[in-house]
Curated annotation (Swiss-Prot):
Family under the similarity heading: Belongs to the HSP33 family.
Key words of the record: Chaperone, Cytoplasm, Disulfide bond, Redox-active center, Zinc
GO MF assignments: protein folding chaperone; unfolded protein binding
Disulfide linkage: 239-241, 272-275
Cell compartment(s), UniProt: Cytoplasm
Function: Redox regulated molecular chaperone. Protects both thermally unfolding and oxidatively damaged proteins from irreversible aggregation. Plays an important role in the bacterial defense system toward oxidative stress.
Protein name: 33 kDa chaperonin
Organism in which the protein naturally occurs: Listeria monocytogenes serotype 4b (strain CLIP80459)
Name of the gene: hslO
Gene Ontology CC terms, in alphabetical order: cytoplasm
Length: 294
């Protein structure tokens, strides 16, 4: 099944809800970055959370999320847009612990760390950026997105993200949900939401069992009849890197640096952090870039 995200209204229009299956997308990220179990779970959770923030944006806006904890994984970066295109990378892809956490799951908190920052940069188009930042309060990532939304954007939310990793480090299931309270929600509605959230199985297990974004939202809302589906968006790992973009980046280094690449290295190779695609530049190509540089 191809990955996709569903947006809906629930609780008599008092909550905006999102759910996504991201299994194939996170499989692609794992394959490109050769991530081990804990790094895979952390990257997959971050990418899925970023996907939800991207889905909140307007047509031409983009979101970049950076989670910088004090754990061995190091910084995790993901970006997404309103079209469901997502990419991401983790600084240390090879983190695996033989011991599980107290809940019997991969110890993502230990990998990410419990001290650090979650930063969100919104590219609003027209060269305008908005930056928000909150401390990491959990290291489990879903709770950190929840805290960011409540603190930085003043939106009471609940974010659940999960990745099920096989013993051979391949991805079995991935996805998540996000619920946001809208102004006017009554205490009764809040109580009902809390009851449904408590009864919800873990995200990765639901997806492993074949649940769809629609069926996850039905569980979240307390029934299919309580959902008003707004939009369904395909989700995929997409990177917009290109040789031309890297060429422009090399030009920005200046003539001295490019001359050094030509005379000392006799060429250059650039690798994209997000997708690991590599671009080779010959001496002749570097000479052309040298001519364009200042």
């Amino acid at each position: 099944m191809s990955d996709y995200l569903v947006k809906a209204l629930a609780y008599d229009g008092m909550a905006r809800v999102y759910a996504a299956v991201t299994t194939e997308t996170i499989k692609e990220a794992q394959r490109r970055h050769d991530t081990w179990s804990v790094s895979s779970a952390a990257l997959g959770r971050t990418m899925t959370g970023t996907l939800f923030l991207g889905a909140m944006q307007k047509e031409d806006q983009k979101i970049t999320v950076k989670i910088e904890g004090d754990g061995p994984i190091g910084p995790i970066v993901a970006d997404s847009n309103a079209q469901g295109q997502i990419r991401g990378y983790v600084t240390n892809p090879h983190v695996h612990f033989s011991e599980l956490n107290e809940a019997g799951k991969l110890d993502v908190r230990r990998g990410v760390g419990t001290s650090g920052m979650l930063s969100v940069v919104k590219d609003l188009g027209f060269g305008e950026n908005f930056t928000g930042q909150t401390p990491i309060i959990s290291g489990e990532i879903g709770e950190d997105f929840t805290y960011y939304l409540a603190t930085s954007e003043q939106i009471n939310s609940s974010v659940g993200v999960g990745v099920l990793v096989n013993p051979d480090d391949t991805i079995e299931a991935a996805g998540g949900f996000m619920l946001q309270l809208l102004p006017g929600a009554t205490d009764e509605i809040i109580d009902e939401i809390e009851k449904n959230l408590t009864a919800l199985p873990t995200v990765s297990r639901m997806i492993e069992a074949g649940e769809t974004p629609e069926s996850i939202l039905a569980k979240l809302a307390g029934g299919e009849d309580k959902l008003q589906i707004l939009e369904k968006i395909p989700v995929s790992f997409e990177c917009n890197c290109s040789k031309e973009r890297f060429g422009s980046a090399i030009i920005s280094l200046g003539k001295e640096e490019i001359r050094s690449m030509i005379e000392e290295d006799h060429g250059a190779e650039a690798e994209c952090h997000f997708c690991r695609n590599a671009y080779d530049f010959s001496e002749e190509e570097l000479e052309k870039l040298y001519d364009e540089a200042k």
